[in-house]
Protein backbone atom coordinates (compact mmCIF):
# COMPACT_ATOMS: atom_id res chain seq x y z
CA UNK A 1 0.00 0.00 0.00
CA UNK A 2 1.40 3.40 -0.97
CA UNK A 3 0.31 6.61 0.74
CA UNK A 4 1.85 9.91 -0.37
CA UNK A 5 4.78 8.10 -1.95
CA UNK A 6 5.67 6.23 1.25
CA UNK A 7 5.12 2.63 2.13
CA UNK A 8 2.40 2.09 4.75
CA UNK A 9 2.15 -0.77 7.21
CA UNK A 10 0.06 -3.58 5.80
CA UNK A 11 -0.91 -5.47 8.95
CA UNK A 12 -4.37 -6.22 7.61
CA UNK A 13 -6.83 -8.25 9.65
CA UNK A 14 -9.47 -9.96 7.52
CA UNK A 15 -10.88 -12.56 9.91
CA UNK A 16 -14.38 -12.40 11.38
CA UNK A 17 -12.74 -11.75 14.77
CA UNK A 18 -11.76 -8.20 13.79
CA UNK A 19 -11.38 -6.18 16.96
CA UNK A 20 -13.83 -3.37 16.26
CA UNK A 21 -13.36 -2.01 19.79
CA UNK A 22 -9.65 -1.40 19.08
CA UNK A 23 -10.58 0.45 15.90
CA UNK A 24 -13.30 2.57 17.54
CA UNK A 25 -11.00 3.58 20.41
CA UNK A 26 -9.08 5.61 17.82
CA UNK A 27 -12.16 7.65 16.91
CA UNK A 28 -12.75 10.55 19.32
CA UNK A 29 -16.39 10.85 20.34
CA UNK A 30 -18.46 13.06 22.57
CA UNK A 31 -19.97 11.58 25.71
CA UNK A 32 -23.61 11.75 26.79
CA UNK A 33 -25.69 10.64 29.75
CA UNK A 34 -28.86 8.80 28.76
CA UNK A 35 -31.69 8.73 31.32
CA UNK A 36 -35.07 7.05 31.13
CA UNK A 37 -37.92 6.16 33.45
CA UNK A 38 -38.88 7.86 36.69
CA UNK A 39 -39.02 7.20 40.42
CA UNK A 40 -37.89 3.70 41.36
CA UNK A 41 -37.86 2.74 37.65
CA UNK A 42 -35.38 5.46 36.66
CA UNK A 43 -32.22 4.27 34.92
CA UNK A 44 -29.19 5.93 33.34
CA UNK A 45 -26.05 5.07 31.43
CA UNK A 46 -23.06 6.72 29.78
CA UNK A 47 -23.38 6.72 26.01
CA UNK A 48 -21.14 7.64 23.10
CA UNK A 49 -23.09 5.98 20.28
CA UNK A 50 -25.16 9.00 19.29
CA UNK A 51 -25.91 10.22 15.77
CA UNK A 52 -27.91 13.16 14.46
CA UNK A 53 -30.27 11.67 11.85
CA UNK A 54 -32.35 14.61 10.62
CA UNK A 55 -33.02 18.24 11.45
CA UNK A 56 -36.58 18.42 10.14
CA UNK A 57 -38.09 16.73 11.99
CA UNK A 58 -35.31 16.54 14.58
CA UNK A 59 -34.24 12.94 15.18
CA UNK A 60 -31.30 11.18 16.80
CA UNK A 61 -30.15 7.56 16.76
CA UNK A 62 -28.64 5.84 19.80
CA UNK A 63 -27.19 2.38 20.32
CA UNK A 64 -27.95 0.54 23.57
CA UNK A 65 -26.66 -2.89 24.56
CA UNK A 66 -29.57 -5.27 25.11
CA UNK A 67 -28.08 -6.76 28.27
CA UNK A 68 -27.87 -3.36 30.03
CA UNK A 69 -30.26 -2.53 32.86
CA UNK A 70 -31.20 0.67 31.06
CA UNK A 71 -32.32 -1.16 27.89
CA UNK A 72 -35.33 -2.80 29.55
CA UNK A 73 -36.51 0.47 31.11
CA UNK A 74 -35.92 2.41 27.89
CA UNK A 75 -37.91 0.07 25.67
CA UNK A 76 -40.74 -0.09 28.21
CA UNK A 77 -40.91 3.69 28.84
CA UNK A 78 -40.59 4.74 25.20
CA UNK A 79 -38.82 8.01 25.99
CA UNK A 80 -35.38 9.18 27.07
CA UNK A 81 -33.26 12.22 27.81
CA UNK A 82 -29.74 12.86 26.55
CA UNK A 83 -27.31 15.22 28.26
CA UNK A 84 -24.05 16.11 26.51
CA UNK A 85 -21.32 16.05 29.14
CA UNK A 86 -18.85 18.88 29.70
CA UNK A 87 -15.10 18.26 30.09
CA UNK A 88 -15.26 18.53 33.90
CA UNK A 89 -17.90 15.75 34.12
CA UNK A 90 -15.53 12.83 33.52
CA UNK A 91 -16.21 11.38 37.01
CA UNK A 92 -19.95 11.28 36.19
CA UNK A 93 -19.26 9.51 32.89
CA UNK A 94 -17.21 6.89 34.73
CA UNK A 95 -19.86 6.50 37.45
CA UNK A 96 -22.69 5.95 34.97
CA UNK A 97 -20.64 3.45 32.96
CA UNK A 98 -19.92 1.34 36.05
CA UNK A 99 -21.88 -1.59 37.44
CA UNK A 100 -22.57 0.49 40.58
CA UNK A 101 -24.29 3.31 38.71
CA UNK A 102 -27.12 4.99 40.59
CA UNK A 103 -30.67 4.26 39.54
CA UNK A 104 -34.19 4.60 40.84
CA UNK A 105 -34.78 7.52 43.19
CA UNK A 106 -30.99 7.96 43.62
CA UNK A 107 -30.81 9.26 40.06
CA UNK A 108 -32.58 12.42 41.26
CA UNK A 109 -29.37 13.32 43.12
CA UNK A 110 -27.70 13.88 39.74
CA UNK A 111 -30.36 15.14 37.32
CA UNK A 112 -33.22 17.60 37.56
CA UNK A 113 -36.52 16.45 36.06
CA UNK A 114 -38.21 19.17 34.01
CA UNK A 115 -41.59 19.02 32.28
CA UNK A 116 -41.43 21.26 29.23
CA UNK A 117 -44.35 21.49 26.82
CA UNK A 118 -45.88 18.47 28.55
CA UNK A 119 -42.74 16.35 28.04
CA UNK A 120 -40.27 15.10 30.66
CA UNK A 121 -36.61 16.00 30.22
CA UNK A 122 -33.88 15.18 32.71
CA UNK A 123 -31.26 17.92 32.88
CA UNK A 124 -27.78 17.36 34.26
CA UNK A 125 -26.54 20.59 35.90
CA UNK A 126 -23.31 21.77 34.27
CA UNK A 127 -23.88 19.74 31.09
CA UNK A 128 -23.59 21.25 27.61
CA UNK A 129 -27.24 20.72 26.61
CA UNK A 130 -30.09 18.25 27.00
CA UNK A 131 -32.67 16.66 24.71
CA UNK A 132 -35.96 15.00 25.57
CA UNK A 133 -36.89 12.32 23.01
CA UNK A 134 -39.64 9.82 22.25
CA UNK A 135 -38.67 6.44 20.79
CA UNK A 136 -40.08 6.23 17.24
CA UNK A 137 -38.49 2.98 16.11
CA UNK A 138 -36.23 0.20 17.36
CA UNK A 139 -33.86 -1.65 15.03
CA UNK A 140 -32.22 -4.98 15.84
CA UNK A 141 -28.42 -4.77 15.70
CA UNK A 142 -27.34 -8.13 17.17
CA UNK A 143 -26.19 -7.48 20.78
CA UNK A 144 -27.49 -3.89 20.64
CA UNK A 145 -30.69 -2.15 19.62
CA UNK A 146 -30.61 1.06 17.63
CA UNK A 147 -33.32 3.44 18.80
CA UNK A 148 -34.57 6.29 16.66
CA UNK A 149 -35.60 9.16 18.89
CA UNK A 150 -37.83 12.06 17.90
CA UNK A 151 -36.55 15.15 19.69
CA UNK A 152 -39.38 16.88 21.55
CA UNK A 153 -37.48 19.24 23.86
CA UNK A 154 -34.05 20.90 23.81
CA UNK A 155 -32.61 22.55 26.92
CA UNK A 156 -29.49 24.73 26.62
CA UNK A 157 -26.77 24.07 29.15
CA UNK A 158 -23.48 25.49 30.38
CA UNK A 159 -22.55 28.31 28.04
CA UNK A 160 -19.00 28.16 26.72
CA UNK A 161 -18.09 24.87 28.42
CA UNK A 162 -15.85 22.43 26.55
CA UNK A 163 -17.15 18.93 25.72
CA UNK A 164 -16.08 15.70 27.36
CA UNK A 165 -14.38 13.49 24.76
CA UNK A 166 -13.64 9.75 24.80
CA UNK A 167 -10.49 8.70 22.90
CA UNK A 168 -8.17 5.68 23.21
CA UNK A 169 -10.00 4.53 26.32
CA UNK A 170 -9.59 7.85 28.15
CA UNK A 171 -11.90 10.74 28.95
CA UNK A 172 -10.67 14.29 28.47
CA UNK A 173 -11.33 17.68 27.00
CA UNK A 174 -10.42 19.28 23.71
CA UNK A 175 -7.57 21.49 22.57
CA UNK A 176 -8.41 24.29 20.17
CA UNK A 177 -6.06 25.08 17.32
CA UNK A 178 -6.26 28.40 15.52
What residue ranges belong to the model's regions?
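Basic, polyanion-binding surface patches
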Residues: 2-178
Amino acid sequence: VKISGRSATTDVITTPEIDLRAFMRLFPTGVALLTTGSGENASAMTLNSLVSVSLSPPRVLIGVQRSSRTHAVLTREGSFSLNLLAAHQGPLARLFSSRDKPGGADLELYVERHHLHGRPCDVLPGGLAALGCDVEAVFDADDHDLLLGRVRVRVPGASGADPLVFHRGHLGGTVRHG
